[in-house]
């Protein structure tokens, strides 16, 4: 059971992530459609994504591109830590940078492919350190990685963006 301590920033967790052509796309649960969100599709703020390649008919979902975060999301993240727990969340920094521009304090994600069981374990530890112990994101990422290590199948590591904050020790 995770409960935030008083004064602890909030966290947003996104499970499914895809990386392609130097962009990271966040999966939605909305099925891809030619009749919905036409402006967002035309401007490539929403793109079709799928979990696995398979032959037609296509049965994918909408994926949120970095421009969707910048122009279509309302409000600010007010220092929130955004956690991209799926594969490749920080393989490219375009989406992470968009969240920072919208006011997120930090973005945490994997630098490559990650198994479901490993990300579940790592993010559970990360949330414990962020919410139960009230650690800053940089320290929480370091502790979670010390607990679980890189993904045993893919070697990917949990990282924090922006790297300058991680290096300087700022939360």
Question: How does the language model describe each region?
Answer:
Residues 1:
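Short, structured active-site "lid" loops
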Residues 13-121:
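Catalytic cores of nucleophile-dependent amide-cleaving enzymes
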Residues 80-171:
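Active-site-proximal C-terminal subdomain of hydrolase catalytic domains
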């Amino acid at each position: 059971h995770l409960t935030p301590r008083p004064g602890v920033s909030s966290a947003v967790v996104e499970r499914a992530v895809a990386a392609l052509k130097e962009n990271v796309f966040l999966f939605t649960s909305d099925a891809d459609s030619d009749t919905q969100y036409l402006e967002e599709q035309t401007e490539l703020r929403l793109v079709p994504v799928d979990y696995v390649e398979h032959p037609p008919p296509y049965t994918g979902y909408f994926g949120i591109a970095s421009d969707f975060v910048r122009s279509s999301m309302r409000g600010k993240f007010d220092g929130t830590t955004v956690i991209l727990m799926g594969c490749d969340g920080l393989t490219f920094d375009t989406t992470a940078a968009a969240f920072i521009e919208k006011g997120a304090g930090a973005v945490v994600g994997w630098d490559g492919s990650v198994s479901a069981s490993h990300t579940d374990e790592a993010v559970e530890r990360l949330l414990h350190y962020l919410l139960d112990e009230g650690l800053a994101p940089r320290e929480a990422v370091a502790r979670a990685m010390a607990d679980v290590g890189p993904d045993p199948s893919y070697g990917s590591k949990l990282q924090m963006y922006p790297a300058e904050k991680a290096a300087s020790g700022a939360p």
